[in-house]
C-alpha cells in the first residue's frame, strides 16, 4: 500500500506573524461553530423528555445521533481532505452544519429531529477530522502543542456559548428559537472562517482510494501506541459526555430544583479547558506524556467522587476538576496522535476522532440505563470504571520509549 510521506522542507507558520493571528481567529470561529451546533441540545435534553415524553436515554439520542454520524463521517472526510484539500472540506462542513441546525429548529416530530441531528453530525465531521491535521501541517513544530491547545480552548468556549445560549433562549422563548439563533451564529462564523483561513502551504494531495482507507484503518489499529490512544479517546469523550448529559437531570430535580438557565450556566465550567489544555501542552514538553495523561485521568476520577455530595457548590467543584482533567487529557492525546503519525495525518486524526465521538455516542446513551436504575450513583460508577481502564492504558503506554 502506498503511503504519503511529508517532506521536512516546509513553510511553517510562526508565532507572532499575521498568518498565526488569522489561523488562531479562524479556528476559534470553527470551534465555536462546530461545538455550539453539536452540543446546543445537551442542556435541553430535559425539555425534549418533557415535550416528547421520553426517558433520559431516549432524549440523549439527540446528541448521540450527531456524534455517531460525526464519528462515521470522519472515516471519510479525513481521507477526502488528503485528496481535495483541508480548507475546502472544513468550509463546506461549516455551512452545511448551520443549514441542518436551522432545519432542525423547524421540525415538530422526534424522529425528524433525530434525522436532522444525524445530518448535522455528518456535516461537522469535516471540521473535526481535518482541523488538527491542518494545524500539524502548517504550524511550526515548536508551537504545535500550543496551537492545538489553543484550538481545543476555542472548542471549549464554543461549547460553552452554544450550551448557555441554548438554555437561555429555551427558557425565555423556546428550544426552536434557540436552535435558530445558534444556526445564525454558526453561519456567520463559517463566512468569517472562509475569509480568514490561509490556504495550505504544506499540503500534498493524494488520490482518494476507498480500499486504501480500509487498509490504512486496519494498519493504524495494529500500531501498539496508536491503538491505545484511539481507545483512550473513546474513554475520555464517553466519560465527559455521560457526566454532563445527566448532571442536568440531577440538578433540575429534588433536592436542588435548579432552573434551565442555571443548568446552562454550568457550561461555564468548560472554560477551565482554556487554561488546562495549553498548560498540558506545556507540561508534555517537559515531562513524559504518559505521566501527564495518568495525572489528568486521576483528576477526572476525583472530580466524579466529589459530585456525590448533595451540596451544589461541591458538585460544581467536582465538575470543574473533572473538566480540567478531561481537557488536559484530550490535549495530550491530540498532540500525541499528531506526533506519532508521520504518514497520512488526515487519516490518522480521523481514526482517533472516530473513536473519540463513537465513545460519546455509545457511552452517552447506554449510560442512561444506569441513570434509570441507580440515578447519579450508577452514572458515577459507570464513569469511574472506564477511567480506571484509561489509567491502566496510560501506564502501559509508559513502557514505550520517549513517551
Curated annotation (Swiss-Prot):
Membrane topology: Multi-pass membrane protein
Keyword Hydrolase: no
InterPro entries for the chain: MFS, MFS_dom, MFS_trans_sf, Sugar_transporter_CS
GO molecular function terms noted in the UniProt entry: transmembrane transporter activity
TM region(s), chain numbering: 25-47, 62-81, 88-110, 114-136, 143-165, 175-197, 229-251, 256-278, 290-307, 311-330, 350-372, 376-398
Localization annotation: Cell membrane
Protein name: Uncharacterized transporter bbp_532
Organism: Buchnera aphidicola subsp. Baizongia pistaciae (strain Bp)
